[in-house]
Amino acid sequence: MKIVTWNINSIKTRLNLLRNFLSKENPDILLLQEIKCETEKFPFDELSDLPYNFYVHGQKSYNGVAIISKFPADEIIKDFPNNYYSDQARFLEIKLSLPIGFCNIISLYAPNGSFVGSDKFVAKLAFYDNFINYLSTKKSFDEKTIIGGDFNIAPFDIDVYSPKLLAETTCFTEIEQKKLRTILNSGFEDLYRLMHPCKQEFSWWDYRAGCFEQNKGMRIDMILGCNNTIDYLENCYMDYNLRTQEKPSDHIPVIASFKK
């Protein structure tokens, strides 16, 4: 079983890349972020020939998340309690039966935070506080939960191209990292880092000339699995090929494979 997360950065612009990716990788579940379209303008018709169910929480021009799944959802949730950004489409959860058991699958697009000290940065921290509180309710029920998304936080020095240059800049501050570690310490694992403890790879590069070619990136896209999913994990890796295609997203997919 294969679960993928990908910040597609406009599904309209990247529709052909999406179709090719689905055909090549054949994921069981694909979590998308930054689809940048309203729910009713999601390309349902253009993808209707594919063997998937489509769950969408869209927003005009900005944000937007979706879950594309071979398995039908029993329940769909489009927000969590006290979400600071409840007016923005940044969260989508489905509950469904999978080969590894009944699961909660979450597609998350965390806010960037603008610059350190700004109102948006403070709001980002509040978003994380409330998301952490929401996850704690799942832990109390011992539910299987997998979160995929653009977290807009690089966890450790190994996850950025230059810790010195990026020190205490947005997405790489100690206070942001503490929020992410609170999630990890509450019973979740960063599946890529679990499989590759010392490997340096990135999931995002600025579009500015040379950033991808010079590998000046950050690893801010992740799949987190709660502890009761780890025994099923086979591998977790990234697909660099999509960043070399024409009109790519600035993010690449993160792929986790599980035993059936």
Question: Language-model segments: what does each one mean?
Answer:
Residues 1-52, 62-65, 155:
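N-terminal, active-site-proximal structural segment of metallo-dependent hydrolase catalytic domains
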Residues 1-10, 102-117, 148, 251:
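Active-site-proximal beta-strand elements of phosphoester/diester hydrolases
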